[in-house]
Amino acid sequence: RTLERGLTYRCGTASNLGVALPTPQFAVLDQPSTASLFQTINRLGAKADFVILDAAGADSPIFRRVVALADTLVTPVNASFVDLELLGRLHPVSSMPGCAGCFGQTVATLREEKLAHKMGRIEWVVVKNRVRAAEKRQLARVDAALQRLSVAQDFRIAEGLSERVAFRELFQFGLTHLDLELIPE
């Protein structure tokens, strides 16, 4: 629920400072069901150029429904082999991909089902999250492994999201660097 909290903080900051911050409409499904998911998408999506569905990565009926509806699935992973194991197994010596990990298998199954029902293809994008410059050696190994997994699991790799102190400090206000010029001194 981090995305929801960030957007809620953003609304509070805009109200407290009396500034107009661009803010998307958003909703949280407290009792997630397929019916409430479709109702919310129809209600909010009618006026939107695109819809972002933020779901926990645990395999559940609502997660499966969200992925089945997606045109693009974005999966953040920490730059660690523990996270990569969820996408696909790597041989400990050669680092060559083996079978899909539990998350990779779930995504593969859902992609196949969507194609079988002629509902289009899900583009899968994996992005390294919380990348710290101090971990250069580990990052090089993770990058190489991700490159091999991307071929085996058919996903695209996006540029990593750096861990920036400034971002962490702005989160409690629901802000980004792009908002700073809108905020009065």
Task: List where the protein language model places each region.
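Short aromatic-enriched loop/helix-cap "lid" or pocket-rim segments at secondary-structure transitions
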Residues: S15-G18, L87-G88, R137-A140, L170-G174
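Short, solvent-exposed beta-strand-terminating loops
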Residues: F81, E159, E163-F171
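P-loop/Walker-type NTP enzyme "switch/lid" segment
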Residues: R1-I52, G57-P61
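Conserved catalytic-core segment of NTP-binding enzymes
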Residues: A56-E159
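Flexible, glycine-rich phosphate/dinucleotide-binding loops
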Residues: C11-T13, V82, A133, F167
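C-terminal boundary of histidine-terminating zinc-finger modules
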Residues: F171-E185
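Short, solvent-exposed polar/charged micro-motifs at secondary-structure junctions
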Residues: L37-T40, F167-F173
